[in-house]
Design a protein with these regions (language model features):
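Hydrophobic packing positions in regular secondary-structure scaffolds
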Residues: 1-270
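Active-site His/Glu-centered metal-binding helix of metallohydrolases
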Residues: 437-438
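Alpha-helical transmembrane segments and their membrane-interface boundaries
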Residues: 262-425, 429-433, 442-455
Length: 455
């Protein structure tokens, strides 16, 4: 299958066919396209045209396409469909994890109505079961579809069961072996059962060493485990060890992307998860808290400057370097905190090595502070200062501010992480605001001491 590229010409041609009501030609245009490509097309169409395309798909492909549509768009898209259509045309043909995510996005009343119209009662039961788990746990990520065989079966029985169970799966990553109580015992490869005698017992063939996670395992931990052991799928067990589902790499990738989006927004000073398609009020609510905090922080900085009004009036050139000091402090702090937050998120930085990281950061900060301070010293000399008081003030202040910002930007995320608070809060507006206030204090106090003494 060739990679599809959505062009303006293709979209215009498709819209003309839709407006003409030519369902046959529309079906030909999208035939053979991957569900993700069709989802991309639907997101570019208005709701009426998207529905026309969607209803031209067969039930199985419609379910696959719906799973690929962005969550926010998907919620708006299905609002116009009756509960019976959602249940029988879409949810009955989706994987249990995708179906559960879709149902979870509906109001409670609509959830009950949709589930009551489902023809696949086993699928309905799986969805209800999955809805009980927190979305940020292994239980919330897992799907119920898997291939499971009993350790007491023969290879012949196993082959028959694998063939039957595989009908509900797109890919078979592993065959899981359980005992009579459905407790996970190990895994079995397809090669093993194909090459083994049909009369052989599964108990003599399976691999007992298998990595699994419990339903309440945090999703972030699941992602780290799968990354560490290079897994494409991992079984999920309940508290007593019974096999209840499996998580595949695509589910983990989706979770990682969502978490990265949240962290990026938090680092940008957006307190809630918002999309460009959200209402103006929703976007305002997400941005306003940090803007108000930044406003009050700016007022604190203004008040601090007013306290040194006499010194600034006596040495007006002092005001010229305030933006340099605050900008450098903010930039250095963000750089340091971003490195720490990245390390904590990828589990490559532990609290045990936190002190070592601070020491390393101090070393780097000393080098950066020395270089930047030397540059600013030479630049201030170019302004033709009559004395060395101002160059020394700016140079010394910048050196101390860079050193402090580096240490603070490194230590604060580690402290938040130890307090079980998302360290992403430590980056962006908070670091900038804190370093602005403290950096100004350092600069103005240094100026008062040096300028009044040497000026």
């Amino acid at each position: 299958m060739q990679q599809f590229e959505l062009t303006h010409e293709f979209l215009s041609q498709l819209e003309e066919l839709i407006d003409a009501g030519n369902k046959t030609e529309v079906s030909k245009q999208i035939a053979g396209l991957h569900p993700a490509d069709i989802a991309e097309i639907l997101e570019e169409l208005n709701n009426e045209r998207a529905q026309f395309v969607f209803l031209s798909l067969d039930n199985e492909k419609a379910g696959d396409v719906l799973a690929e549509i962005d969550e926010e768009e998907r919620v708006h898209f299905i609002e116009s469909f009756p509960a019976e259509t959602i249940a029988r045309r879409f949810i009955d043909n989706m994987d249990s994890d995708d179906a559960a995510d879709l149902v979870a996005s509906m109001p409670n009343e609509q959830q009950h109505e949709v589930l009551s119209h489902m023809e696949d009662l086993e699928q309905a039961g799986d969805i209800v079961d999955l809805l009980h788990y927190d979305e940020d746990t292994a239980g919330g990520l897992m799907a119920k579809e898997l291939v499971m065989v009993n350790e007491n079966w023969t290879v012949l029985t196993c082959l028959r069961e694998v063939s039957r169970q595989a009908e509900n799966l797109d890919e078979i990553y592993n065959i899981y072996v359980v005992d009579d109580d459905n407790k996970l015992k190990g895994r079995l490869s397809l090669k093993k059962i194909i090459t083994a005698p049909t009369s052989a017992k599964i108990s003599n063939l399976y691999y007992p060493d298998i990595i699994s996670v419990k339903t309440d395992e945090p999703a972030e931990s699941v992602a780290l485990i799968m990354q560490k052991y290079d897994l494409v799928a991992i079984p999920v067990i309940d508290q007593v060890g019974r096999l209840v589902g499996r998580i595949t790499i695509d589910d983990v990738v989706d979770f990682i992307r969502e978490e990265a989006d949240k962290d990026y927004q938090m680092m940008s000073g957006i307190s809630q998860d918002v999309e460009s398609s959200d209402s103006i009020w929703a976007q305002t609510k997400a941005r306003l808290p940090w803007l108000i905090i930044a406003l009050f922080g700016g007022m604190v900085s203004a008040w601090m400057i007013s306290r040194y009004e006499a010194e600034i009036a006596l040495f007006p050139v002092t005001a010229m370097f305030i933006p340099v000091i605050t900008a450098m402090g903010g930039n250095v702090g963000i750089q340091s905190s971003a490195i720490v937050v990245k390390g904590l998120a990828s589990n490559s930085l532990s609290l045990k090595h936190g002190f070592q990281n601070i020491v390393k950061e101090i070393g780097g900060a000393l080098i950066n502070a020395t270089i930047c301070s030397s540059i600013i010293f030479l630049l201030t000399l170019c302004f033709g200062m009559q004395t060395l008081a101002m160059p020394i003030t700016v140079t010394l202040s910048l050196f101390v501010v860079i050193l402090f910002a580096s240490i603070f930007g490194t230590a604060f995320p580690l402290l938040l992480n130890r307090m079980k608070i998302d360290p992403a809060l430590a980056t962006g507006p908070f670091i900038t605001l804190t370093n602005d206030i403290i950096g100004l204090n350092i600069y103005l106090i240094t100026g008062r001491l040096i300028l009044t003494g040497l000026g």
